[in-house]
Amino acid sequence: MTNIRKTHPLAKIINDSFVDLPAPSNISAWWNFGSLLGICLILQILTGLFLAMHYTSDTATAFSSVTHICRDVNYGWVIRYMHANGASMFFICLFLHVGRGLYYGSYMFPETWNIGIVLLFAVMATAFMGYVLPWGQMSFWGATVITNLLSAIPYVGTSLVEWIWGGFSVDKATLTRFFAFHFILPFIISALAAVHLLFLHETGSNNPSGIPSDSDKIPFHPYYTIKDALGALLLILALMTLVLFSPDLLGDPDNYIPANPLNTPPHIKPEWYFLFAYAILRSIPNKLGGVLALALSILVLAIIPLLHTSKQRGMMFRPLSQCLFWLLTADLLTLTWIGGQPVEHPFIIIGQLASILYFTILLILMPAVSIVENNLLKW
């Protein structure tokens, strides 16, 4: 009798994706983040579902309902903080996953890479709208500032902003629709993730050496299932340490003050995972220019495959490109730091220099250094 796992229409899909999938024999722990992101997504959907059972998306009661979840619901505080800090873990995994793709040339699978960029935008949109829901000071003013950026679009900007708000300011209609979008987007993300995997499995995984691994494949199970299980264990350990020891470490204290349209917080800033983009936005004095730079800070990833000039796929054997990659990493950390600082000297000029460096590395230096490395190969 043939094994049901290989014949049953549903079991066959799971089998071909997670059991009998041929995988390169040399992929490192940097290839764990796909499964970790899947775990993060499932965790966020589950905790979010339980939060939605108690949350009310009304300006009068939203803040109180979150307080009620934390104080009165059985283990509500655990669910709430797992959801809030789960978003941070999600973004840590996302940034590491994208960084791995850049380092090892995984962007040479264009469909997989481009769907990944769409996924990144979708997760960022979801996180932004989720941050608005508790209706604290930073929720309200963050929503006001970020949605207002769309007014920089010529001709249709103002109408577009009022259309998104559902009125002339961020109010009840805005909160209700943000809750609706925040609820539906994770399911769209799940569907996109399935397509992301579909395209990945068309080509098979890349590997650290960047050379084809067809001659040396091993089954996904048990080798990589056990490896992913270890990664999952470490992820849950990190998340629960954060949740149980310092749940507010990555949050903003201003969000414990109920939203007040008449009182602006001294420093409006988003969650830490948006600070690098926020720093790029603020480094340009012109509003439309800032918005374009903000969009390009992520969209620049889409043209990375077109700028690949190296004869080698990954950076494993390219020390000059490696130096640039780690300079880019340091630059992003600098931007993240600047995004959380007030707009004053010397932070303004540091932010502007870091923003210029970010685009210079990706668009000019990396392709140029790759050409130099190609010529060095001839020696």
From Swiss-Prot:
SUPFAM superfamilies: a domain/subunit of cytochrome bc1 complex (Ubiquinol-cytochrome c reductase), Transmembrane di-heme cytochromes
Cysteine-cysteine disulfides: none
Required co-factors: heme b
Highest taxon listed in the record's lineage: Eukaryota
Gene Ontology terms, MF aspect: metal ion binding; ubiquinol-cytochrome-c reductase activity
Chain residues that bind heme b b562: H83, H182
Annotated Gene Ontology cellular component terms: mitochondrial inner membrane; respiratory chain complex III
Transmembrane segments: 33-53, 77-98, 113-133, 178-198, 226-246, 288-308, 320-340, 347-367
GO biological process entries: mitochondrial electron transport, ubiquinol to cytochrome c
Subunit-structure text: The cytochrome bc1 complex contains 11 subunits: 3 respiratory subunits (MT-CYB, CYC1 and UQCRFS1), 2 core proteins (UQCRC1 and UQCRC2) and 6 low-molecular weight proteins (UQCRH/QCR6, UQCRB/QCR7, UQCRQ/QCR8, UQCR10/QCR9, UQCR11/QCR10 and a cleavage product of UQCRFS1). This cytochrome bc1 complex then forms a dimer.
Name the UniProt record assigns to this protein: Cytochrome b
